[in-house]
Every structure is written in C-alpha cells, then in structure tokens.
Amino acid sequence: IMPSLVGSEMCIRDSLKGEDLAIGTPALQKGRILRPADLGLLASLGIGEVPVQRRLRVAFFSTGDELRSIGETLDEGCVYDSNRYTLHGMLTRLGCDIVDMGVIKDDPAALEAAFRTACENADAIITSGGVSVGAADYTKQMMAELGDVTFWKIGMRPGRPMAFGKIQSHGKEAYLFGLPGNPVAVMVTFYFLARQALLHMMGASAVEAPPMLRVVSKAAIRKRPGRTEYQRGILSLNSDGAVSYTH
C-alpha cells in the first residue's frame, strides 16, 4: 500500500501471527468434504497430499417399458426418461463416481441382470420406478430374491413406495435404493433419504441439514395424519417482510 494513499481515518490492520490457525489445532477435521478453500488452506501449510476416502461408486438406472432416452423416437404412450438426468446431476454434485446403466425394461430377467452388474461394479445402486404394486413392478421382488428388503413404503408423500435394502452377486454386495418413478418423488426421496445415506457411506462426519423457513401458506394444505408431506410451491416476500408460500 502506498503511504500517500493512506488517510488518517483509515483502519490499517496488520496480520497477526497465528490468527488463521493456532498451533496444536487441526487444520481440517476428519470426515470433512474438501472444498476449494480447504485445498488452498492445505497448500498454504505446504501440504501436498492428505489421506482421503475413495470416491463412492454409484450405479443407477430407470425401469419401464414406456421410457425412452433422449434421441430415441417417442412412441405413443411413451415418455422421455428424465429421472436419470436428475440423478446424474445430484450424484455428480455429491462427488460420486457414477455408472449410468440407462433404461431397463419391465422384465424380471433383464432386471436381475442389471442388478447383478450394478452390484458387482458399484458400492450403491439407485433405481427409479418399479417399486409400487403394479403388475410390472419387479424391483422389490428382485431385491428380495438377491438379498433383503430392509423397508418398503414410508410415511412420506411424495415417495411413499420407496424401498431400501442390500443385494449380493458373486461375492459382492451393494446397498440398493429403490426410488419411485415419479420425477418429484425421485428428488424428494434422494434428497431427504438416499443423499444422507450416501454421505455416511462416504465417511462424511457431518451431514448438513436442509435449510428450514417458517412461511405462511396462501391456500389450505391437507394431509393425512402421521404422514410427512412435501409440497411444491413458490416463495415470495410480502410487504411486511414475511415469507408466503403459494402452490
């Protein structure tokens, strides 16, 4: 700083030795997910390498005869598979190594083959669709045949038919999150359930809780007693500073 540019009213602060990090205190806690600032801190201490957990490898696919991937012809009664792209983005943000296995048809043999391939090549598996009670919903059945179903159906909407368990194949095992096929249910069950479990599997010591806001709804909200419901809506700031919700 040029002395001529320093005025009498300006506060000039000298850096103090040890003000960023005191001797004897850990620079970073075990289980912390490394962020860009953490890498800079390590570099400032002359540390080029630190022991870390291996990236979690997650395989995922969608199930359904009606699903088409982007670029394929959309036949009558079919829809484009959006869930895989949603899961791809959420898993990438989480820092996982991902294996996109595409769309699997509603066929028990095809589903078993996909489960076995995923189990032998990943730490965890995420599927979307096939966990309800329809005639072509084979995910829960296949989970039971290849391993166990820890739980199926939860007191939450959207996302009630979610299934969770562990499957085995040729000496390998993997946790399996069977998410519903509804796109909103996929995001809700991933964010509130699967994401927390995956972070724990990564070795993260602290899982950040989702931000909570107290808002006033502009319309009546009905829900079944004992069931947690997540509503989509738009938040707006009122003239009095209160936050309101419209769905």
Regions found by a protein language model. Give the residues of each.
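N-terminal small/polar loop signature for handling phosphorylated ligands or for N-terminal nucleophile
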Residues: 88-145
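Flexible glycine/proline-rich
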Residues: 21, 144-245
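Short glycine-rich anion-binding loops that position phosphate/pyrophosphate groups of nucleotides
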Residues: 65-66, 130-133, 181
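Short acidic, glycine/serine/threonine-rich loops at helix termini
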Residues: 39-40, 70-74, 111, 137-140, ...
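Single conserved hydrophobic/aromatic residue that forms the stacking wall/gate
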Residues: 1-7, 12, 247
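Short acidic loop-to-helix transition motifs that present clustered carboxylates
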Residues: 34, 103-111, 156-161
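Short, glycine/charged-enriched hinge/interface segments at domain edges or termini
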Residues: 8-9, 13-100, 105
